[in-house]
Amino acid sequence: MEDGVLKEGFLVKRGHIVHNWKARWFILRQNTLLYYKLEGGRRVTPPKGRIVLDGCTITCPCLEYENRPLLIKLKTRTSTEYFLEACSREERDSWAFEITGAIHAGQPGKIQQLHILKNSFKLPPHISLHRIVDKMHDTSTGIRPSPNMEQGSTYKKTFLGSSLVDWLISSNFAASRLEAVTLASMLMEENFLRPVGVRSMGAIRSGDLAEQFLDDSTALYTFAESYKKKVSSKEEISLSTMELSGTVVKQGYLSKQGHKRKNWKVRRFVLRKDPAFLHYYDPSKEENRPVGGFSLRGSLVSALEDNGVPTGVKGNVQGNLFKVITKDDTHYYIQASSKAERAEWIEAIKKLT
């Protein structure tokens, strides 16, 4: 990393004039967040734009877009709003932590609060949020939504915040009420649950990360619409139930060479095991469905040389490249943002081939 750079990597940014979403390379410095356009796997200089952090406010998690639950919102001193999407909850929280640190540099009390926050949201490795939600939907042992009343209004198919905390503990997903609240907050952040009614919506607006979910018998929640599987064909049924049923092992933004036009585009890659698949998503699209993917059974993965443009790579793209050859001899050319990131992906994929 260059001198003075606090963090760098891909984020998906909402456009100012046309509200489309595009992947940009972001570089965080002490008081500035720069973002660059990419062409041929390389960032184009000068930067496409810069966000001055002095006087900025940050909202994380930002729930303004239902289909984009991993957002950070920055509001500058001049009230310009930036919406930035990360590839995972961990990466979003890492960016939010570093950006908040850059905003509050020179205020030790704020930095100490940040360190407490950073260490408070850890999901145990043996627990999958998808598994928790599946169990919640179980007709015999799950949590049963029912009509609930709040301030004179009746909300159908809801459950109480305190009831969910009770259920998480009784189902052995959490050992204490504090742990259960943390888990419930994660489920809400990842768009599996949503708040309903005045009490729970008010907690979201308070902006306090530690108090997003309320262990309260007056706070109402429901399953988010995004959890309901929209199935329109036999092909989609087989894709969602088999390929996408595995446990997520790793995810992140990588550049990929297209098969037909050979152009390079940033995609969000998700590596799953049991069954072993590597899928990739178009981060500019709203729907959370892969645009491609392949089974890793019988695949080969290897790093490509860093000196010059390797064989099979189109354009002047070089550095941090690796290749996956599938069982049916399809070649995928992928570029990481650093040697370390490339090594991590290769190691993770090799374990599943």
Swiss-Prot record:
CDD domains xref list: DEP_PLEK2, PH1_Pleckstrin_2, PH2_Pleckstrin_2
Entry keyword annotation includes Cytoplasm: yes
Gene3D superfamilies: Pleckstrin-homology domain (PH domain)/Phosphotyrosine-binding domain (PTB), Winged helix-like DNA-binding domain superfamily/Winged helix DNA-binding domain
Residues found modified as N-acetylmethionine: M1
Subcellular location: Cell projection, Lamellipodium membrane; Cytoplasm, Cytoskeleton
Residues annotated as domain PH: 4-104, 247-353
GO MF annotation: an example: phosphatidylinositol-3-phosphate binding
Tissue specificity annotation: Ubiquitous. Most abundant in the thymus, large bowel, small bowel, stomach, and prostate.
InterPro entries xrefs: DEP_dom (IPR000591), PH-like_dom_sf (IPR011993), PH_domain (IPR001849), Pleckstrin (IPR037370), PLEK2_DEP (IPR037369), WH-like_DNA-bd_sf (IPR036388), WH_DNA-bd_sf (IPR036390)
Alphabetical keyword list: Acetylation, Cell membrane, Cell projection, Cytoplasm, Cytoskeleton, Membrane, Phosphoprotein, Repeat
SUPFAM superfamilies: PH domain-like, Winged helix' DNA-binding domain
Any GO BP: intracellular signal transduction
One GO cellular component term: membrane
Record-annotated DEP domain positions: 139-225
PROSITE patterns registered for this protein in UniProt: DEP (PS50186), PH_DOMAIN (PS50003)
Membrane topology annotation: Peripheral membrane protein
Function: May help orchestrate cytoskeletal arrangement. Contribute to lamellipodia formation. Overexpression of pleckstrin 2 causes large lamellipodia and peripheral ruffle formation.
Name this polypeptide is given: Pleckstrin-2
Native organism: Mus musculus (Mouse)
Originating gene: Plek2
